[in-house]
């Protein structure tokens, strides 16, 4: 068996955390390829190393003396090295960083050094080969990631390495200019490595024991999800659930490699297994609940709307022309409601309203802002009668008015719209009826 293991910043914030990671890797020989993040916070008031690097480079870019800022970063790493008892020095690496900062190497280069340096320490600690991600993760000159080229380069390079540490978050152009993924991009690197070596499993280690059914900031003591499909994960991630960078899904999904979300601080926990498909029946009707607020609804009314050929297309064209994407579009015979992100809509509100009037000459347009959308997601819904009824019942019992409901033809998810003020109570009510009352 062959595993790729990625560890997040909180898992590598200190020497003590490094030791936990070392124990996890050494516990199974199959954990052959390691993708580390930069050191995260050691305590709530602490600063992540990536943020320290951004601040240090900003000072350098402004022509300020950045010596103390760079020394503070070096101290963070030295503390880890000393705590691990390593006879290992990063002096040469920091001298190169100092020189490149002075020569304005760029913020992408600056941010990437957190993973680069942590990777060097990890390789020394484990006795694994260190492979600079700049050698195997390729971007074009525009900064766009090159998936297939990366897979070819990485596959050929890792084929020669029995065990290796590959820093996450960054890569480089063919000319060597460092480019980073978006924040949290080490998840993507782990996924790319898993695909390149055709791993049996991609373990993503963080500070939580997998995905939770609902946001723990809203639902205290939310239960964890044992198994989730890629489709379910995509639906939940789109509506705000976050543990894994959503772009990390595609490389391993394409290769048919499952992902296991694990907890560095509780390695005995099984975590959440993410798979393409499963015959396992879920414990609950739903797999998860996720939502986000900040939406607006535009309701358009016109008599005989359903008889007017091209009505919807004309309305949608107005939104497209103004660069505003549409989230959901429930409709009736003579009405259609369009849900959009409030901030995007407000930037072009008058142009869009004028465009709708010109395009379809509606009888009436009504606007409503400060709305939230909640997704109830689960493969178990397809074989369960009365799911929508239970949703309405739960929300009615909590005195919450439903502004919109939309169910996809796959029966994988149901979206409900509620007022912003009802958002948290709605999630609590849905969790109670689908999880707590089903125990």
Residue ranges and their predicted role:
Residues 2-3, 31-34, 128-129, 162-165, ...:
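Structural motif
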Residues 244-246, 255, 265-272, 346-349:
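Surface-exposed amphipathic alpha-helical tracts and adjacent flexible/coil segments at the periphery
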Residues 1-244, 249, 341, 417-419, ...:
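Nucleotide/pyrophosphate-binding catalytic subdomain
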Residues 39-40, 208-210, 259, 263-268, ...:
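Glycine-rich beta-alpha junction loops
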Residues 270-439:
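A conserved regulatory-domain signal marking ACT and ACT-like small-molecule sensing domains
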Residues 41, 137-139, 210-211, 267-269, ...:
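Short secondary-structure capping/turn micro-motifs that flank functional sites
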């Amino acid at each position: 068996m062959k595993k790729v293991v990625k560890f997040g910043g909180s898992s590598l914030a200190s020497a003590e955390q490094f030791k936990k990671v070392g124990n996890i890797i050494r516990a199974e020989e199959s954990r052959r390829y390691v993708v580390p993040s930069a050191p995260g916070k050691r305590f709530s008031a602490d600063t992540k190393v990536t943020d320290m690097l951004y601040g240090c480079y900003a000072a350098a870019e402004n022509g300020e003396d950045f010596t103390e800022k760079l020394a503070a970063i070096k101290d963070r790493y030295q503390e880890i090295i000393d705590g691990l008892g390593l006879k290992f020095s990063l002096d040469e690496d920091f001298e190169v960083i100092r020189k490149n900062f002075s020569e304005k190497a760029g913020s992408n280069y600056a941010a990437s050094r957190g993973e680069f340096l942590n990777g060097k320490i990890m390789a020394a600690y484990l006795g694994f080969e260190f492979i600079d991600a700049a050698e195997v993760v390729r971007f074009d000159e525009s900064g766009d990631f090159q998936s297939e080229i990366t897979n070819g380069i990485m596959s050929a390079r890792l084929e020669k390495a029995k065990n290796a540490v590959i820093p996450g978050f960054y890569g480089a152009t063919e000319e060597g200019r460092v480019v980073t993924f978006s924040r949290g991009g080490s998840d993507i690197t782990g996924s790319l490595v898993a695909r390149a070596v055709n791993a049996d499993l991609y373990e993503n280690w963080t500070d939580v024991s997998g995905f939770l059914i609902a946001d723990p900031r809203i639902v205290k003591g939310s239960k964890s999800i044992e198994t989730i499909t890629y489709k379910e994960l995509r639906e939940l991630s789109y509506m705000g659930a976050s543990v894994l960078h959503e772009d990390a899904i595609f490389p391993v999904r394409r290769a048919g490699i499952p992902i296991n979300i694990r907890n560095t601080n509780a390695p005995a926990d099984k975590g959440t297994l993410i798979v393409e498909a499963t015959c396992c029946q879920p414990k609950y009707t739903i797999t998860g609940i996720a939502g986000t607020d900040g939406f607006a609804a535009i309701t358009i009314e016109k008599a005989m709307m359903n008889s007017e050929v091209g009505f919807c297309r004309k309305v949608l064209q107005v939104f497209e022309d103004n660069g505003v994407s549409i989230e959901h579009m429930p409709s009736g015979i003579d009405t259609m409601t369009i849900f959009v992100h409030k901030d995007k809509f407000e930037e072009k509100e008058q142009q869009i309203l004028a465009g709708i009037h010109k395009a379809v000459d509606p009888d009436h347009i009504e606007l409503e802002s400060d709305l939230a959308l909640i997704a109830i997601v689960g493969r178990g819904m397809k074989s369960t009668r009365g799911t929508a009824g239970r949703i309405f019942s739960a929300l009615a019992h909590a005195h919450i008015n439903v502004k919109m409901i939309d169910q996809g033809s796959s029966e994988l998810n149901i979206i409900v719209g509620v007022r912003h003020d009802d958002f948290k109570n709605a999630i609590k009510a849905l969790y109670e009826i689908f999880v707590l009352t089903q125990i």
